[in-house]
C-alpha cells in the first residue's frame, strides 16, 4: 500500500502505479492512496501522472510507501507561438488556438488547410469543391477573407501555407482576438495563422525519419449517375410528353430494346475512377554543441475522380542554426517547392477556380439512351473512339460531356516558390541582463506558369436505322453530319501566362525580459520594412493549322495574335511594439501596437495605428483558492480589446486606371487612344475591426480535464466594396469604397481530456463555435411595401432593389450576411419571388 502526494503534500488523485516490466498496476483513490497485490520484494514501481515527472520507486521489501511527485516544469513553462515571438502559455492574455502538428500528420490530406477542419476553435474550414487539389477556405470568427499567414516570421499567402507538409511543422497558432493579432496591424483583420517549422537538436547524432502513405477513396454508395438507367430516361421522356400533351415518344419496342439487351450508356464508365494519392517524405535532424540542422524533402502525387486530373508536388526545406560566438547565433532557413497540376479545360470558370460544378451537373444529366462514342459503322462503343456522338442539352446543342473530360483540350499550371531567411540573434546580457537584439532578412520568389489549350468539339450525329420504329437502333455514321461545339469561343486557341513575383522583408528586433522579485517585465520593439513587385506576361494565338499545342502552329495574322504585359510594385513600413507585465504570477497585463504605412492607399491615408490592451487574472494562484488546489489545477480569467486593419486589396485601387482600344477617326484617319476605365478614389482608407474578447481557461484533476470558454464582439467598419454605377457609366469600373459595416458576435468552447494508463497516453478533445453576424451599414435599410404578383394577387414584397439585383441571398442592413429572402404568401397564394 502507499500514498502519492505532490510537493505541497496534497494527495494526487488518479496517479498510475505499475510494476516495472509487468502489467500489474492500479491507480490512486480520492485520498491519493493505492493498494497493489502480488508485488515481489525486489520490484520497482513506476509512478506517473500528467503534469508530473515520472518516478521509479524500489519496493525493497517495504509494505507501505509515501511517494512524492515533482511538477514537470517543462509543462509549466510551455510556450506558444505569438506574433514576433513566443510566450508562456500560462501568461497568455489573448485568444489563441493551437493545433498540434502530430494531429495533422495522421490525416491523409493532400493540402494543409483540408486537414484543419474541427481542430481550431473559431476557425471555420469549408471545402468549396471536390475537385482534386482544391483547397479549403479558412474563415476566422466571421471574417470575409483568408487570414494572414506568417511562416517562420515571413508573411506568405495561402498557397504557401497549403504547400506545407505536416511533418515539417513545429507549432501552429491561430490568433483570433485583437490582443494577439493587432501586432500585425493592417493585415490582420481576418485573423492570423502563425507557423514555425522544425529545427535540429544540439548534441544529437543524425536521426532519419521516413513517412510514406498511400490513400484512395471509393464511394460508399452508388453514384447518382449509376442509379438512373436508360429505362428511367424513357420514362422521363414519356412523362414530359404527357405534361405537354404530345404523343409518347417511347413504346414497348424501345423499352424492350434497352431492357432485353441490357443497354445503358453511363457517363461514369468513361470518365470516373477512384481517386488516390501517395505521399513520401524523408527528413534528417541533429546537431553538435554549436550547430543544429533539419533537412526534409517530400513528394506528393495524386489523381482525381475524373481520369484527366493530375497533381504533383515537390518540397525541400533546410533549417540551420549555428552559434558563431557565445553571444551570436545565425539561422539560415531555405524553403523551395513546386507544384504541377493538369486538368481538362473548362471555359466557364476561372482558370484557377477549382469549382466546375456546372460540368458535374451536365455529366449527371447525361442521357442513358444515346451512346457517347461509336464506330464508323454506327455500332456503339464502350471505349473512346474517333467518333464522339453529340447529345442535346437545351441551349447546349451538339455537346459531348465525356469528350470534354477525356479530349485533347487541357489546362496545365506550374507554381514554384523559393524563400530564404537569414537572421542573427545577438545576446546583449553583457550590457544588461535580459537584453537582446535580432536582425532578419528574407527574400521570397514566386513564379506561375499556365498553359491553356482549347479546341472545339467535333461531334457526330447519331444515325437512326429505323426512324419510324425504334429510333434508338443505330445506323452507319454520316461523316457529313456533325456539329462543332465552340464553347462560346470564336476560335480555337492556345494561351500562355507567366507571372514572376518577389517580396523582400527586413526586420530589426530589440527585446528585453527580466524579473525583479515578484515583478516580471518584457518589452519588444520591431522595425519592419518590405517591398514587393512582379511582372505578368500573357500571349494568345488563334486559328491553329493543326491540333498541335505549340504556338508556331497558330496563325501569324496580327488579328489572331494577342499579347499583354503588366507590372506592379509596392512597399510597406511598420513600427511594432509589445509590453508585458506580470505581478506575482497572478496578475498579467499587456499592451501592443503596430503603426503601419502602405502604398496600397493614397497619400494622407497610408498610415494606420492599431493598438490593443489585455489583462489576465490567474485566480487559481490566489491564497483563498488553496482549499480547491487538490482538484482545481488552473483557473484564469482574461479580457482584451483592440483594433485591426485589412489591406487585402490590389495595387493602384485608389488611382484612376486607363485602358486601350478607345479609338477615334480624325479626317478619316484612325487614331489610337486611351480612356479612363476605373474612377479614382483618394478617400480610400483602412478597413478597421475592433474586437472585445473575454475568456475563461480552466483545468481540473491536474489538468487532465481542461477547457476554455470565450465570448467576443467583433465590429468591422469601412468594409471595402465596389458600388453599382449608373447605366450611363457602364464603360467604367467603380472604384473600391469604404461602404459597409458588419458586427460579429460569438461563443467558443473547447474541452479536452488527457491521461495515461501505464505506458499508453491518450487524449480526447472537442470544440464548439457559434457566430452570428449583422450588417450594420450597407446602402440603407430594407423597405417593405405592398406589391402584386403575376396573377394580380397582393403579396408582402420585400423591396431590396436598391441594395441588390435580383439575387435571393442578399446583403441588407439589420440582417445577417447573405440571408435568403422570399415573399410571404398572401391568403394562401403560393407564389414567391426572389426579392
Q: What is the predicted role of each segment?
A:
Residues 1-317, 329-331, 337, 393, ...:
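Short, small/polar-rich motifs associated with maturation and membrane association
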Residues 4, 19, 27, 148-151, ...:
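Hydrophobic beta-strand positions
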Residues 13, 36, 55-56, 157, ...:
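A sequence-level detector of short linear motifs
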Residues 104, 145, 313-315, 319-328, ...:
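Extracellular/periplasmic, surface-exposed regions of secreted and cell-surface proteins
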Residues 209-259, 756-835:
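Conserved small-residue
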Residues 243-263, 278-279, 351-400:
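Acidic, glycine-rich flexible loop segments
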Amino acid at each position: 500500500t502507499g500514498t502519492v502526494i505532490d510537493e505541497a503534500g496534497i494527495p494526487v488523485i488518479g496517479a498510475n502505479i505499475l510494476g516495472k516490466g509487468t502489467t500489474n498496476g492500479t491507480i490512486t483513490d480520492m485520498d491519493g492512496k493505492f493498494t497493489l497485490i502480488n508485488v515481489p520484494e525486489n520490484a520497482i514501481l513506476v509512478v506517473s501522472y500528467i503534469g508530473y515527472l515520472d518516478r521509479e520507486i524500489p519496493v525493497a521489501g517495504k509494505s507501505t510507501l509515501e511517494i512524492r511527485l515533482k511538477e514537470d516544469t517543462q509543462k509549466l513553462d510551455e510556450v506558444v507561438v505569438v506574433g514576433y515571438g513566443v510566450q508562456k502559455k500560462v501568461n497568455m492574455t489573448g485568444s489563441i488556438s493551437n493545433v498540434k502538428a502530430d494531429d495533422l500528420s495522421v490525416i491523409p490530406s493532400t493540402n494543409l488547410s483540408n486537414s484543419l477542419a474541427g481542430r481550431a476553435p473559431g476557425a471555420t474550414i469549408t471545402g468549396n469543391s471536390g475537385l482534386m487539389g482544391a483547397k479549403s477556405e479558412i474563415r476566422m470568427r466571421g471574417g470575409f477573407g483568408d487570414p494572414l499567414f506568417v511562416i517562420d516570421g515571413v508573411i506568405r499567402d495561402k498557397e504557401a501555407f497549403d504547400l506545407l507538409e505536416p511533418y515539417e511543422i513545429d507549432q501552429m497558432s491561430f490568433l483570433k482576438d485583437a490582443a494577439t493579432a493587432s501586432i500585425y496591424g493592417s493585415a490582420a483583420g481576418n485573423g492570423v495563422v502563425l507557423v514555425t517549422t522544425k529545427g535540429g537538436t544540439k548534441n544529437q547524432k543524425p536521426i532519419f525519419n521516413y513517412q510514406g502513405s498511400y490513400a484512395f477513396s471509393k464511394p460508399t454508395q452508388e453514384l447518382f449517375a449509376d442509379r438512373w438507367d436508360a429505362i428511367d430516361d424513357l420514362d422521363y421522356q414519356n412523362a414530359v410528353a404527357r405534361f405537354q400533351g404530345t404523343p409518347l415518344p417511347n413504346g414497348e419496342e424501345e423499352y424492350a430494346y434497352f431492357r432485353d439487351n441490357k443497354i445503358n450508356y453511363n457517363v461514369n464508365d468513361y470518365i470516373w475512377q477512384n481517386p488516390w494519392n501517395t505521399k513520401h517524405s524523408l527528413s534528417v535532424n541533429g546537431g553538435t554543441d554549436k550547430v543544429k540542422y533539419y533537412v526534409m524533402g517530400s513528394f506528393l502525387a495524386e489523381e482525381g475522380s475524373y481520369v484527366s486530373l493530375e497533381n504533383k508536388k515537390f518540397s525541400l526545406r533546410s533549417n540551420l542554426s549555428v552559434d558563431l560566438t557565445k553571444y551570436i547565433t545565425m539561422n539560415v532557413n531555405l524553403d523551395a517547392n513546386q507544384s504541377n497540376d493538369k486538368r481538362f479545360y473548362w471555359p466557364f470558370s476561372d482558370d484557377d477556380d477549382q469549382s466546375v460544378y456546372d460540368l458535374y451537373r451536365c455529366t449527371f444529366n447525361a442521357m442513358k439512351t444515346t451512346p457517347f462514342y461509336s464506330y464508323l459503322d454506327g455500332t456503339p462503343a464502350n471505349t473512346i473512339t474517333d467518333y464522339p456522338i453529340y447529345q442535346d442539352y437545351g441551349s447546349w446543342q451538339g455537346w459531348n460531356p465525356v469528350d470534354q473530360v477525356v479530349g485533347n483540350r487541357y489546362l496545365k499550371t506550374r507554381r514554384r516558390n523559393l524563400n530564404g531567411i537569414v537572421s542573427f540573434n545577438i545576446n546583449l546580457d553583457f550590457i544588461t541582463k535580459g537584453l537582446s537584439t535580432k536582425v532578419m532578412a528574407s527574400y521570397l520568389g514566386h513564379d506561375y506558369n499556365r498553359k491553356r489549350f482549347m479546341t472545339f468539339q467535333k461531334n457526330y450525329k447519331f444515325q437512326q436505322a429505323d426512324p419510324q420504329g425504334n429510333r434508338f437502333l443505330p445506323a452507319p455514321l454520316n461523316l457529313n453530319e456533325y456539329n462543332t461545339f465552340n464553347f462560346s469561343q470564336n476560335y480555337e486557341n492556345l494561351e500562355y501566362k507567366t507571372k514572376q513575383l518577389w517580396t523582400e522583408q527586413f526586420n530589426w528586433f530589440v527585446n528585453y525580459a527580466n524579473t525583479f522579485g515578484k515583478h516580471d517585465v518584457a518589452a519588444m520593439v520591431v522595425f519592419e520594412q518590405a517591398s514587393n513587385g512582379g511582372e505578368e506576361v500573357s500571349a494568345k494565338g488563334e486559328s491553329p493549322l493543326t491540333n498541335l499545342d505549340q504556338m508556331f502552329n497558330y496563325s501569324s495574322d496580327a488579328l489572331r495574335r494577342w499579347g499583354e504585359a503588366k507590372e506592379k510594385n509596392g512597399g510597406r513600413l511598420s513600427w511594432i511594439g509589445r509590453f508585458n507585465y506580470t505581478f506575482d504570477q497572478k496578475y498579467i497585463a499587456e499592451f501592443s501596437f503596430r503603426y503601419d504605412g502602405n502604398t496600397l492607399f493614397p497619400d494622407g491615408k497610408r498610415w494606420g495605428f492599431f493598438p490593443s490592451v489585455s489583462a489576465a487574472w490567474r485566480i487559481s494562484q490566489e491564497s483563498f483558492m488553496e482549499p480547491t488546489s487538490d482538484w482545481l489545477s488552473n483557473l484564469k480569467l482574461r479580457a482584451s480589446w483592440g483594433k485591426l486593419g485589412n489591406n487585402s486589396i490590389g495595387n493602384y485601387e485608389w488611382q484612376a486606371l486607363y485602358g486601350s482600344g478607345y479609338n477615334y477617326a480624325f479626317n478619316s484617319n484612325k487614331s489610337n487612344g486611351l480612356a479612363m476605365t476605373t474612377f479614382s478614389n483618394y478617400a480610400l482608407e483602412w478597413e478597421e475591426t475592433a474586437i472585445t474578447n473575454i475568456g475563461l481557461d480552466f483545468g481540473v484533476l491536474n489538468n487532465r480535464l481542461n477547457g476554455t470558454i470565450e465570448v467576443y464582439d467583433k465590429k468591422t467598419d469601412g468594409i471595402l466594396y465596389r458600388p453599382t454605377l449608373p447605366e450611363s457609366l457602364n464603360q467604367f469600373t467603380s472604384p473600391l469604397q469604404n461602404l459597409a459595416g458588419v458586427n460579429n458576435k460569438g461563443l467558443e468552447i473547447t474541452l479536452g481530456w488527457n491521461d495515461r494508463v501505464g505506458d499508453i497516453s491518450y487524449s480526447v478533445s472537442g470544440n464548439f463555435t457559434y457566430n452570428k453576424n449583422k450588417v450594420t451599414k450597407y446602402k440603407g435599410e430594407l423597405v417593405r411595401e405592398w406589391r402584386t404578383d403575376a396573377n394580380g394577387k397582393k403579396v408582402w414584397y420585400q423591396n431590396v432593389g436598391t441594395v441588390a439585383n435580383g439575387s435571393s441571398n442578399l446583403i441588407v442592413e439589420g440582417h445577417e450576411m447573405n440571408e435568403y429572402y422570399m415573399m410571404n404568401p398572401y391568403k394562401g397564394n403560393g407564389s414567391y419571388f426572389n426579392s
